[in-house]
A protein has these predicted regions:
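N-terminal cap/lid segment of alpha/beta-hydrolase-fold proteins
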Residues: 14-61
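Short, solvent-exposed loop/turn and secondary-structure capping segments
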Residues: 55, 78-82, 105-109, 174-175, ...
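Primarily recognizes the serine-hydrolase "nucleophile elbow" in alpha/beta-hydrolase
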Residues: 145-208
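Loop/turn elements at helix/coil->beta-strand transitions in domains of secreted/extracellular proteins
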Residues: 63-67, 90-94, 156-160, 179-184, ...
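The feature captures the conserved acid-bearing segment of alpha/beta-hydrolase catalytic domains
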Residues: 184, 193-266
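C-terminal catalytic histidine-bearing segment of alpha/beta-hydrolase fold enzymes
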Residues: 256-289
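Alpha/beta-hydrolase
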Residues: 68-71, 188
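Cap/lid segment of the alpha/beta-hydrolase catalytic domain
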Residues: 70-142
Length: 289
């Protein structure tokens, strides 16, 4: 609750619905997906003119489960169309979400009294919005919460999985700790704990190291919280030949401690894999399995 209060100034997640729902939205890039009934385009308005545009891929034949695919700083979820195709073909509803300011999301111009007019185009600019009462980290999590408010009841979702690549992988480590509606999280090339960030490039992403946030709960505690619960699981996959980031197996340093803590709590699973089957920064066939 302390984390939720930090983000929203409340003791609970947002209860509201998307501000706009466009049913049967047309995007020709996805016209060849098998088992696709339609795309619903969701718009979620937030403070400081920020918007999140989300695609909900509804299958013809549903299995009652939802996969949220969260893209990283590469932009649009079209980059992982193979992942969307894979799960849609198996009857999963699929939600495509992008990081703040990327893909179809808004890039507002903010007139700061202290700094002048600045167009927000890069996530590392978001810290400029920080005040004692407002924390821009919420922009990373609020779209998921609001989208789930609509989708879970409207489409009779029984189980929800969160899959994220890169920046989306970081989101996958953090968000399930805030929202127990996420049963399984699969983070690909997501993040290392702060004490294992050994290079200048490990500190490139503002959201990874906000001191006030991680003093409430550090990464090791997020691993536990996002794994904890009946039939809940957090899985991390790191690519040995990743061309972007976190191409290491440093999880071996803390993995046993997290598993020991979960054993003492009595429920929850934490797993890690080192994928050497693919060279690049994406979800491999091994990862999809």
């Amino acid at each position: 609750q302390e984390l939720i209060h930090y983000l929203w100034g409340s003791n609970e997640l947002p209860k509201r619905m998307p501000d706009k729902i466009e049913n049967n939205f047309k995007d020709s890039r996805y016209s060849n997906l098998k088992n696709l009934k339609q795309i619903n385009r969701l718009t979620i308005d937030m403070e400081h003119q920020m918007k999140s545009i989300i695609y909900f891929f509804e299958p013809n034949e549903k299995n009652g489960k939802l996969v949220i695919y969260h893209e990283g700083h590469g932009g649009d979820w079209i980059r992982e169309i193979d992942t969307i195709r894979h799960f849609l073909g198996k009857g999963y509803c699929v939600l495509g979400i992008a990081m703040p300011l990327l893909a179809f999301n808004e890039n507002p111009v903010i007139d700061f009294p202290e700094f002048g007019k600045i167009k927000l185009e890069f996530h590392n600019q978001l810290h400029l919005l920080e005040t004692d009462e407002f924390h821009p980290l919420k922009f990373y999590f609020e779209p998921i919460a609001v989208a789930l408010n609509y989708i879970i009841d409207e489409f009779n979702i029984e189980r929800t999985y969160l899959i994220g690549l890169s920046g989306g992988g970081w989101t996958t480590i953090i968000y399930p700790a805030l929202d127990e509606r996420i049963s399984h999280g699969y983070s690909i090339a997501g993040a290392n704990p702060i004490f294992l960030r050994l290079d200048e490039t490990d500190y490139f992403d503002y959201e990874h190291t906000v001191p006030e946030f991680y003093r409430i709960a550090n990464y090791e505690e997020f691993y536990v919280m996002s794994s904890f619960g009946e039939k809940r699981k957090l899985v991390q996959i790191f690519n040995k030949w990743d061309t972007c980031c976190f191409s290491n197996d440093l999880y071996k340093i803390y993995e046993a401690d997290i598993k020991k803590k979960l054993t003492s709590l009595g429920k929850g699973t934490f797993e890690n894999y080192f994928d050497d089957t693919y060279r690049g920064h994406k979800i491999s066939k091994f990862g999809l399995k």
